[in-house]
């Protein structure tokens, strides 16, 4: 259904955009990519096939130019922002039904979907 690799890629992009120290341009090593991919797979498993289908078919949700029509890009972005407590993310997506926004927010805020970024010598690691 939804591609966890794209979710992981945009999860990392959102992490770098939102939380990298000002004026730096850190990169994500393979270890970070693998952790983000596992998180994306776990998140997709948690939301289930019915919710995945809803997100995939909701063209308004993936309308932002950065998403290029892919719900996975929006999910990765929203998963990072929601799980890190940025006050934005799934709840801001008016294209999603209120029940879906609340369900996804509740999941994203659970401990198993919250990875902490650590920036060290130009690299971002997820713990």
What do the PLM-derived regions correspond to, one by one?
Residues 42-121:
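Amphipathic protein-protein interaction modules
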Residues 125-126:
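C-terminal edge-of-domain segments
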Residues 1-71:
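Long, contiguous N-terminal structural blocks used for assembly/anchoring
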């Amino acid at each position: 259904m939804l591609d966890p690799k794209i979710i992981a890629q945009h999860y990392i992009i959102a992490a770098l955009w939102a939380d990298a120290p000002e004026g730096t341009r850190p990169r994500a090593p393979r270890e970070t990519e693998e952790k983000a991919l596992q998180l994306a797979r776990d998140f997709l498993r948690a939301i289930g096939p019915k919710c995945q289908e809803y997100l995939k078919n909701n063209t308004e949700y993936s309308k932002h130019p950065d998403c290029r029509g892919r719900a996975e890009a929006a999910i990765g972005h929203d998963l990072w922002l929601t799980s890190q407590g940025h006050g934005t993310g799934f709840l801001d997506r008016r294209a999603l039904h209120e029940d879906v926004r609340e369900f996804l927010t509740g999941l994203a805020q659970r401990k198993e979907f919250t990875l902490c970024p650590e920036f060290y010598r130009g690299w971002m690691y997820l713990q």
